[in-house]
């Protein structure tokens, strides 16, 4: 029930120098290498969601995000690969014509800008626009923010099975990822539970919503996976709020320092919205613990360019 959009398996890399510096063993699942234009975690979810869109005979795909949304860019890209029309509902903000937004435009995506207030009721806006387009003969498939629903979560359920074949997952003390819309941590948690491993999944919240919101959402996503034939026992995950910094998509000075350090010491590029914050959180939580920790690099390199003034 998916189509193959990405380059898998992505490698797992041990960060020797940073592990020595911070006193625990840091391994990175390099999902920044899933593709080029489609790079990052979103394409794993889109393998399932685009499969369903094509199965239902869609001609047009709706999704949403910020102006520099990695998910919106990846959705536009895979839609064009399969001859579908991408319509991106993007939350208004500082418009910098580079990075993801530039790629959206090059891919010929139709962009509908919505205010932050309108974005809070994005499902209603989707419904209005969907009805208008379907009256004109289009068939619309709606993908939620981040591709984070029960079907999309199978992308990271499958990633767990992939990692099981790459390394001894049971030897890890934690798996860490950024949390932006909840689908990645849901899939990881479901996969670990399915394998009956006792490895906690720790999500570092980078949004303005609190951890209670995401705990509830992740549980609903995992519960909904039963509709597709997956039944799992109790999942072990947590979402922490302590490393969000000044706000969503606004890196703190500590985030910027971590981003630069990982680049200059290990040659890995993080992004200022998700992975730099999550990596900093991981370091603070596990410093000098001598534990084995697996970090999921969810990509986001194109988001660097719109924030160049904050980074140099």
From Swiss-Prot:
Give the Enzyme Commission number.
3.5.99.7
Domain of life per record: Bacteria
Question: Per the record's keyword annotation, is Transport included, yes or no?
Answer: no
* An example molecular function term from Gene Ontology annotations: D-cysteine desulfhydrase activity
Keyword list (alphabetical) reads: Hydrolase, Pyridoxal phosphate
Listed cofactors? pyridoxal 5'-phosphate
* SUPFAM superfamilies documented for this protein: Tryptophan synthase beta subunit-like PLP-dependent enzymes
Report the residues modified as N6-(pyridoxal phosphate)lysine.
42
Q: Which InterPro entries match?
A: ACCD_DCysDesulf, D-Cys_desShydrase, TrpB-like_PALP, TrpB-like_PALP_sf
Its UniProt entry gives the catalysed reaction(s) as:
1-aminocyclopropane-1-carboxylate + H2O = 2-oxobutanoate + NH4(+)
Q: Which family does it belong to?
A: Belongs to the ACC deaminase/D-cysteine desulfhydrase family.
Q: Per its record, how is this protein called by name? A: Putative 1-aminocyclopropane-1-carboxylate deaminase
